[in-house]
């Protein structure tokens, strides 16, 4: 017999070598949908302990970008890993559907409400637009392999959710947190609406920087404070500002109580400013000669009055902790209608909250003759000219600084005092209770705690009212004359009645409502509040409107919120505020934040730079599993770099993992775990070591999943596939797997190990490379559920005992020695020994302090299979080994590998060189071992 191929157990599997993910994944998705995989998982996990990851709703506008993909994939990895950990982890995706961006899109296409159609028709078009956006994004999220209740997501525009948002506000009102006030809020003149903190972005802007003198009303009183009654010339207090347009609203000048303020003589007049800033101010205003006449603490100047340069009234000097020495003069222009710090101190001193600016950003009539009707950003030059005319301008220059802008229009915004509704941070202790609750939450990474604590500690009251058309109505009634809210009990009853109607007909029910239907005879005295709720209230109240309401959550609170790091001031904040205001507790147990995506050079993604990466393109070219593997392998706690090159590296890693899985499957051909499994105690020692290796890897992988360290999962998975399996175990077993008798213990032991490893590996992969894990699952032998996602981590792993002779420590030493032997074998290729099986290795040793060599000797003939050489001899060197040739030194054991050409002839069946080829007449061209494996009882293997 010259062709022995038919006698070999060659690997065979239908599992393709190439993933072809972009082509195969859509077919798998179709099967998942047809089978209702999400429903199957829910049924399988019913009754288990719950883990609820509550989805922060993306905005229903535009196609998904790479940041969306990162977010949804991270969530999916957690949900799937929790399922494998024995939890029932339902995932209900959501969308944020109200608000300005959708209004702008509809306006661009159809015009503003009231122009070509009614507000009701406009809302209907907004609802229709949002629904189409949801459908588009949903398809892309599903294509990512994210499992969830995509047929029944939550939308903030669902009638029931809209009704529950109104009920959430009612609970907050009941708990005493709502108040009305004319406070300065971020105002976009293009939106003509207040903006939330999270809707404000900062860009560089050039503004005029001016120093302005406010002359003292009672000159003698001011001079007396400094103990200098004889000062010549008028005395003024100097302020500095970069917003000259706010000067008409000035109502005070703020000083720091503990700073030293100097009276400085210049050019026939005296000016007051912070002593530490005198030198820089004098340089700025060009005063070459000046004299500091005296100093006093800021507190000494409190309530002295100074004349406004052009408004015709005088203003007091007041004391505030917000005054700094970072820039300016140490005297702060204070306009309570145009800044939160100014407002707070204005309230303390009973100042007027003047608001001379209309919603369109122009001065209201009666402000000042040359300013009435002028846009505030065009008014700076007019104000500067006024100051020059009045002799009050000491200096003007241009400066570039960071300025707040609208997130949609990218145009500068203003602080503007308008009648708005606020959730009070302090009236009922919301700030303190929130800070207390923050400490009970696990923040991942842990720096998130300090970040949100700082934000909560310093944030102003939350302005929740908006002057928009497309949003959830506040559903409040106020008295026509006093503007007071309807008495509390009646307010709550009215809100519940409105909520019931909204639950049936949506938010339009509020605008269609005749107040008489609810208020009866009192309707003539009250009017409906036209404001809608801030969209951050919509999404922030979902712990109540969605989590508490959905039956699959069974009344459990959310375990985790997971979003980008910008959401500390966004969704994490609004959710915390609302939950604490409603229930007195945080809405989440854990909060995980991920960084933003950047390109390979660390630059922010930008269409103008052209460095964006489209998730749709990646899925169409490489497949979703490559995108998922990139997300998992990147440390999400910092910026997440992505580029074609980085994705190519992810694809390379994927191939290594896939090749390992394919090797396992191909060598499980013909293996039936029900009949062919070998008991652990009867297995070859090396096979038990391999299963133990998987057990150790699984412990570390599960620990990493539990800690949400997914890049650690991928690294450990790669080490297992490439190092422990690929470069050691899988190479060694090829000879035994291919050449031993098909049903011998030697081969079945090996297959048993491969089976256990494959069962574990496919589960480790499932949360990350979900499509590939599903594909592998379909090729694994043995009875099993239809999907890997319905089960749990594999519990059939075992390993070597520490007290065994050939324990893990021994195999660690063997692997090290093998690495050194392989280096010498590589060196000998230049001398004509082209393959390891052409070699004979003599392992020389001088001592054996840790007993490794003694154990190697006990392996007998089988030691050569570990080193994949035809012959392997161990030789003691009584005279010691030359230090230069030491290749292994651990525990005082030193060895040297000497490689020579193997003796004998090559066996065409097993490719080993041996001296007994042709010794059996019936099989004259093969070795004795192969004869035994073909025609005899087969070789016995105990160790390798």
Curated annotation (Swiss-Prot):
Provide the residue positions that the database annotates as binding Zn(2+): 907, 910, 927, 930
Q: Which UniProt keywords apply?
A: Aminoacyl-tRNA synthetase, ATP-binding, Cytoplasm, Ligase, Metal-binding, Nucleotide-binding, Protein biosynthesis, Zinc
Motif 'KMSKS' region location, chain numbering:
604-608
* Subcellular compartments: Cytoplasm
Q: Which cofactor does it need?
A: Zn(2+)
GO terms (molecular function) for this protein are:
aminoacyl-tRNA deacylase activity; ATP binding; isoleucine-tRNA ligase activity; tRNA binding; zinc ion binding
Cofactor binding mode and count = Binds 1 zinc ion per subunit.
Quote the cellular component terms of the Gene Ontology held in the record.
cytosol
Q: Which residues form a coiled coil?
A: none
Please indicate the residue ranges that the annotation assigns to the motif 'HIGH' region: 58-68
Entry's Gene Ontology BP terms: isoleucyl-tRNA aminoacylation
What InterPro entries does this protein's entry cite? aa-tRNA-synth_I_CS, aa-tRNA-synth_Ia, Anticodon_Ile_BEm, Ile-tRNA-ligase, Ile-tRNA-ligase_type1, Ile-tRNA_ligase, M/V/L/I-tRNA-synth_anticd-bd, Rossmann-like_a/b/a_fold
- Residues reported to bind ATP: 607
Catalysis performed (reactions): tRNA(Ile) + L-isoleucine + ATP = L-isoleucyl-tRNA(Ile) + AMP + diphosphate
EC numbers listed for it are 6.1.1.5
Which residues hold L-isoleucyl-5'-AMP?
563
Q: What does this protein do?
A: Catalyzes the attachment of isoleucine to tRNA(Ile). As IleRS can inadvertently accommodate and process structurally similar amino acids such as valine, to avoid such errors it has two additional distinct tRNA(Ile)-dependent editing activities. One activity is designated as 'pretransfer' editing and involves the hydrolysis of activated Val-AMP. The other activity is designated 'posttransfer' editing and involves deacylation of mischarged Val-tRNA(Ile).
What family is this protein classified in? Belongs to the class-I aminoacyl-tRNA synthetase family. IleS type 1 subfamily.
Q: What is known of its domains?
A: IleRS has two distinct active sites: one for aminoacylation and one for editing. The misactivated valine is translocated from the active site to the editing site, which sterically excludes the correctly activated isoleucine. The single editing site contains two valyl binding pockets, one specific for each substrate (Val-AMP or Val-tRNA(Ile)).
Q: How does it assemble?
A: Monomer.
Give the protein name, as stated in the record: Isoleucine--tRNA ligase
Organism annotation: Salmonella typhimurium (strain LT2 / SGSC1412 / ATCC 700720)
Q: What is the lineage of its organism?
A: Bacteria, Pseudomonadati, Pseudomonadota, Gammaproteobacteria, Enterobacterales
**Which gene underlies this protein?**
ileS
């Amino acid at each position: 017999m010259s062709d022995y191929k038919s006698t070999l157990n060659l690997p065979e599997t239908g599992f393709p070598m190439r993933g072809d993910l972009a082509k195969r994944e859509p077919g798998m998705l179709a099967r998942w949908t047809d089978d209702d995989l999400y429903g199957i998982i829910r049924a399988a996990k019913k009754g288990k302990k719950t883990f609820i990851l509550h989805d922060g709703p993306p905005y229903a506008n535009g196609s998904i970008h790479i940041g969306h993909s990162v977010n949804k994939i991270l969530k999916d990895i957690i949900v799937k890993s929790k399922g494998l950990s024995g939890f029932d982890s339902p995932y209900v995706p959501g969308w944020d559907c109200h608000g300005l961006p959708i209004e702008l899109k509809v306006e661009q296409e159809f015009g503003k409400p009231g122009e070509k159609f009614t507000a009701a028709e406009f809302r209907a078009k907004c609802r229709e637009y949002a629904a189409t956006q949801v459908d588009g994004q949903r398809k892309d999220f599903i294509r990512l392999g994210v499992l969830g209740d995509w047929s029944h997501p939550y939308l903030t525009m669902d009638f029931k959710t809209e009704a529950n948002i109104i009920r959430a506000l009612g609970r907050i009102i009941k708990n005493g947190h709502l108040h009305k006030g004319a406070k300065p809020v971020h105002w976009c003149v293009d939106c003509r609406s207040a903006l939330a903190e999270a809707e404000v972005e900062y860009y560089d802007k050039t503004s005029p920087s001016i120093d302005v003198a406010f002359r003292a009303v009672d000159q003698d009183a001011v001079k007396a404070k400094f103990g200098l009654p004889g000062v010549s010339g008028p005395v003024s207090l100097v302020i500095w500002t970069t917003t000259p347009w706010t000067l008409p609203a000035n109502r005070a000048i703020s000083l720091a109580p503990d700073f030293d303020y100097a009276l400085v003589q210049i050019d026939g007049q005296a000016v007051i400013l912070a002593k530490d800033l005198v030198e820089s101010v004098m340089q700025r205003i060009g005063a070459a000669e000046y004299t500091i006449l005296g100093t006093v603490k800021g507190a000494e100047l409190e309530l002295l009055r100074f004349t406004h340069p052009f408004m015709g009234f005088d203003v007091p000097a007041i004391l505030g902790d917000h005054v700094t020495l970072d820039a300016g003069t140490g005297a702060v222009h204070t306009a309570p209608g145009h800044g939160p710090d100014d407002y707070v101190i204005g309230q303390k001193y009973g100042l007027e909250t003047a608001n001379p600016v209309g919603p369109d950003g122009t001065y209201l009539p009666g402000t000042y003759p040359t300013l009435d009707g002028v846009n505030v950003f065009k008014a700076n030059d007019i104000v500067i000219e006024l100051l020059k005319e009045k002799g009050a301008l000491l200096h003007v220059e241009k400066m570039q600084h960071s300025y707040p802008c609208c997130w949609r229009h990218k145009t500068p915004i203003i602080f503007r005092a308008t009648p708005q509704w606020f959730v009070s941070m302090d009236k009922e202790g919301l700030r303190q209770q929130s800070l207390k609750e923050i400490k009970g939450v696990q923040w991942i990474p842990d720096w998130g705690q300090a970040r949100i604590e700082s934000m909560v500690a310093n944030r102003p009251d939350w302005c929740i009212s908006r002057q928009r058309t497309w949003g959830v109505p506040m559903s409040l009634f106020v008295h026509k004359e006093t503007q007071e809210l309807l008495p509390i009990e009646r307010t709550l009853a009215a809100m519940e009645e409105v909520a019931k109607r909204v639950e049936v007909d949506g938010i339009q029910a509020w605008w269609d409502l005749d107040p008489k239907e609810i208020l009866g005879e009192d309707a003539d005295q009250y009017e409906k509040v036209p404001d809608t709720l801030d969209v951050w209230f919509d999404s922030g109240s979902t712990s109540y409107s969605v989590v508490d309401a959905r039956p699959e959550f069974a009344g459990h609170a959310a375990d985790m919120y997971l979003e980008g790091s910008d959401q500390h001031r966004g969704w994490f904040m609004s959710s915390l505020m609302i939950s604490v205001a409603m229930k007195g507790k945080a809405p989440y147990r854990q909060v995980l934040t991920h960084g933003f995506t950047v390109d390979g050079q660390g630059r922010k993604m930008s269409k103008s730079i052209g460095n964006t990466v489209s998730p749709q393109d990646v899925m169409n070219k490489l497949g979703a599993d490559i995108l998922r593997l990139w997300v998992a392998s990147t440390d999400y706690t910092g910026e997440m770099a992505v580029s074609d090159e980085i994705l190519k590296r992810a694809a390379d890693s994927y191939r290594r993992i896939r090749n390992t899985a394919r090797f396992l499957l191909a060598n499980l051909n013909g293996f039936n775990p029900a009949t062919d499994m070998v008991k652990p105690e009867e297995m070859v020692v090396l096979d038990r070591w391999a299963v133990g290796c998987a057990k150790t890897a699984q412990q570390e992988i599960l620990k990493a999943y539990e800690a949400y360290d997914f890049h650690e999962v991928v690294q450990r998975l790669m080490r297992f596939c490439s190092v422990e399996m690929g470069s050691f175990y899988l190479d060694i077993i090829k000879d035994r797997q291919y050449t031993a008798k098909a049903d011998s213990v030697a081969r079945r032991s090996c297959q048993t190990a491969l089976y256990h490893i494959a069962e574990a590996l496919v589960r480790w992969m499932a949360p990350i490379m979900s499509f590939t894990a599903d594909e592998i699952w379909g090729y694994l032998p043995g009875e099993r559920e239809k999907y890997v996602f319905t089960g749990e981590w594999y519990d059939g792993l075992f390993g070597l005992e520490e007290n065994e002779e050939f324990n893990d420590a021994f195999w660690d030493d063997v692997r090290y020695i093998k690495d050194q032997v392989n280096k010498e074998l590589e060196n000998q290729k230049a001398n004509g020994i082209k393959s390891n099986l052409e070699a004979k290795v003599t392992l020389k040793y001088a001592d054996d302090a840790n007993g490794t060599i003694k154990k190697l000797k006990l392996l007998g003939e089988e030691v050569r299979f570990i080193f994949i050489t035809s012959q392997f001899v161990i030789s003691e060197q009584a005279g010691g080994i030359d230090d230069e040739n030491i290749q292994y030194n651990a525990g005082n054991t030193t060895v040297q590998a000497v490689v020579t050409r193997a003796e004998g002839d090559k066996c065409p069946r097993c490719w080993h060189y041996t001296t007994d080829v042709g010794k059996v007449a019936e099989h004259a061209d093969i070795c004795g071992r192969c004869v035994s494996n073909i025609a005899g009882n087969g070789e016995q293997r105990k160790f390798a």
